[in-house]
Curated annotation (Swiss-Prot):
Name this polypeptide is given: Protein Smg homolog
Family that this chain belongs to: Belongs to the Smg family.
Database matches in InterPro entries: Smg
Domain of life: Bacteria
One Pfam family per UniProt: DUF494
Length: 157
């Protein structure tokens, strides 16, 4: 399923090509690209659920204390290792993620089929969430920079 999400993001969203809105056409395109029907359905459902998070009816996206600290469930820790959780905290500290967008990212990660997520895949999920969350254009650009810009030279000496 994640491969399909990446395919859609890279070929339609990120490349700024007009996105096919007809689900049947999109399904046919993905089938021609070699993806299995069951995985296509899961990926499209994942995207629909991401869009539904924007409606604001999700309780954990509404009420929060600015000074609260996120405690991960065991299932979340199984899927997001220490490096991934640390990266999410880093993104919050540099204001790429808000409490709401962080929770959206975690929600979308937990819906993926993968038993554990690597950091590179998490970065793409963050990018997808920010792209689909209105008012986060600046955060999206910052996240793009974190993904695509490679540092010159060594970070530590």
């Amino acid at each position: 399923m994640f491969d399909i999400l990446m395919y859609l993001f890279e070929n339609y969203v990120h490349s700024e090509v007009e996105f096919l809105v007809d689900e049947d056409e999109l399904t046919q395109e993905l089938t021609r690209a070699g993806f299995h029907q069951s995985e296509i359905i899961k990926a499209l459902s994942w995207l629909e659920n991401l869009a539904e998070l924007q409606e604001g009816d999700t309780p954990y996206l509404c009420d929060h204390d600015q000074h609260s600290f996120r405690i991960y469930t065991q299932k979340e820790m199984d899927k997001l290792d220490v490096e991934c959780r640390g990266f999410l905290l880093f993104l919050e500290q540099i204001k790429v993620l808000s409490v709401e967008t962080r929770e959206m990212v975690i929600d979308r990660v937990m819906e993926l089929d993968e038993t554990a997520l690597i950091l590179e895949d998490l970065k793409w999920v963050v990018l997808m969430v920010l792209f689909n969350a209105p008012g986060n254009e600046s955060a999206y650009e910052q996240m793009e920079d974190l993904i695509f810009e490679q540092p010159d030279g060594r970070l530590h000496s």
